[in-house]
Amino acid sequence: MAVRIGLAFNLRPEAPAPSAGASIASPSVSGSSRDLRYDLPQPDLYAEWDEPATIDAVERALRPLGEVIRLEAVADFPAKLAKARPDFVFNIAEGLYGPNREGHIPAICEFMGVPYSASDPLTLSLALHKSRAKEMLQLRGVPTAPFMLARTVADARNCALPFPLFAKPAFEGSGKGVSVKSLCTTRKELVKQVDYLLSTYREPVLVSSTDGVGTKLK
């Protein structure tokens, strides 16, 4: 009997951003990633999701191993997984909401007893939560750059770390929220960038030294 492989993915939406004053879309409950939401203002909200060509390429690579069943990782994923009953899930889904989003699909697979590729929910969640990941490194004695977590603009104003500093969203990946303005050489720049990131991404901001422990970055 051929192996049944579930391909879990997020398909990047293709739609223009709303014009100024446009009404805000509600979160989708229809099970389609094409239902965009604009209540989160970050310009790169769907940056981690994959283009159709990428998903097609992954499916082609998996076909020699068995039957491939596409399982888009949206609201009805649990129902689709139960119906498809794959032997294994090849997971490239990123999720959308919260610091645990990359662990949602593996957690559902575990709950339903379906083996899956890559890391488990705990590993994915810890890795995406940058301050927690750095705390784990510190606990285990692994060198990591000094850092602080800014939850408010006041935290940035009171930051005691020496400049220059690097500021980025604490729960993002794929370079989301990172730009030339992330490197802050003065407190004024840091406060401005932290204020922007807090209002845009609505999550804490990781502020870290640009020097590693005992190592100069070049």
Please name every model-derived segment:
Residues 10-13, 94-96, 170-172, 212-213:
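Short glycine-rich anion-binding loops that position phosphate/pyrophosphate groups of nucleotides
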Residues 2-8, 38, 82-85, 125-206:
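Active-site nucleotide/adenylate-binding loops and adjacent lid/helix of ATP-dependent enzymes
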Residues 14-19, 173-176, 216-217:
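Short acidic/His/Gly/Ser-rich catalytic and metal-binding motifs that mark active-site loops
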Residues 32-146:
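Conserved N-proximal alpha/beta basic substrate-recognition cap immediately N-terminal to
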Residues 23-25, 105-108, 183:
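Glycine-rich, phosphate-binding/catalytic loops in enzymes
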Residues 208-217:
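Glycine-rich phosphate/pyrophosphate-binding loop regions near the starts of catalytic domains
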Residues 89, 166, 216-218:
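Short hydrophobic-acidic sequence motifs that mark active-site Asp/Glu residues
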Residues 2-29:
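Short, solvent-exposed beta-strand-terminating loops
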